[in-house]
Amino acid sequence: MEPFIKHKGLVAPLDRANVDTDAIIPKQFLKSIRRTGFGPFLFDEWRYLDEGQPDMDCSQRPVNPDFVLNQARYQGASILLTRRNFGCGSSREHAPWALKDFGFRAIIAPSFADIFYNNCFKNGLLPLVLTEAQVDRLFKEVEAAPGYELEIDLPEQQVRTPAGEAFEFEIDGFRKHALLEGLDEIGLTLQHAEDIRAYEARRREQAPWLFTDLEEGR
């Protein structure tokens, strides 16, 4: 995964609460487990005027001009600002895959659904919790200023506005470490590869019968 240290990017405001995973990436796109290629179908039922299907050429589809991500001022946005309980509904890791593939590096909201929140960290996407009052204020500033950007400083755990104001946010230390180092669960495990090999060597000496079938099956 790409490390997340500091990120400055354009903010897109999705002014909706309780956005569920079926809205983020509809069920017909869940057959693939490639992790990539979902960006064009992010918020599919809101972005387009027709019904999306896997492998469609989205460049030829009629778009909904009123949807925020179709508006010219938010093209290239990498930070999504939204409302409480984002990512609720059924569990599907495709939701953070679609957000990441679209180009988002972080999502700011007052709260997230637990499973979605956990899945974001596993895929290098930062779900960042601010207070309702702070989110309300950011919505007003984003809508009033085209080209509005925020800077997210993960080491300092701060969100900085164009005016220089800083909002503090909390994050679990282990998850912070994984994002800073760009490590997913496999990468974190491989950091302990030497310890794992040493443990296996000790176990092979202490209980060789446990490894007999493995050796015979080589």
From Swiss-Prot:
Q: Which InterPro entries match?
A: 3-IsopropMal_deHydase_ssu, Aconitase/3IPM_dehydase_swvl, AconitaseA/IPMdHydase_ssu_swvl, IPMI_Swivel, LeuD
Q: What is its EC number?
A: 4.2.1.33
The alphabetized UniProt keywords are: Amino-acid biosynthesis, Branched-chain amino acid biosynthesis, Leucine biosynthesis, Lyase
The protein's enzyme class: lyase
Instruction: Please name the pathway.
Output: Amino-acid biosynthesis; L-leucine biosynthesis; L-leucine from 3-methyl-2-oxobutanoate: step 2/4
Q: Which reactions appear under catalytic activity for this entry?
A: (2R,3S)-3-isopropylmalate = (2S)-2-isopropylmalate
Kindly name one Pfam family recorded for this protein: Aconitase_C
Q: Has keyword Isomerase?
A: no
Q: Which GO terms describe its cellular component?
A: 3-isopropylmalate dehydratase complex
Q: Per the record's keyword annotation, is Signal included, yes or no? A: no
Gene Ontology terms, MF aspect: 3-isopropylmalate dehydratase activity
Instruction: State the family it belongs to.
Output: Belongs to the LeuD family. LeuD type 1 subfamily.
NCBIfam families annotated for this entry? leuD, PRK01641.1
Protein name (record): 3-isopropylmalate dehydratase small subunit
Protein species of origin: Alkalilimnicola ehrlichii (strain ATCC BAA-1101 / DSM 17681 / MLHE-1)
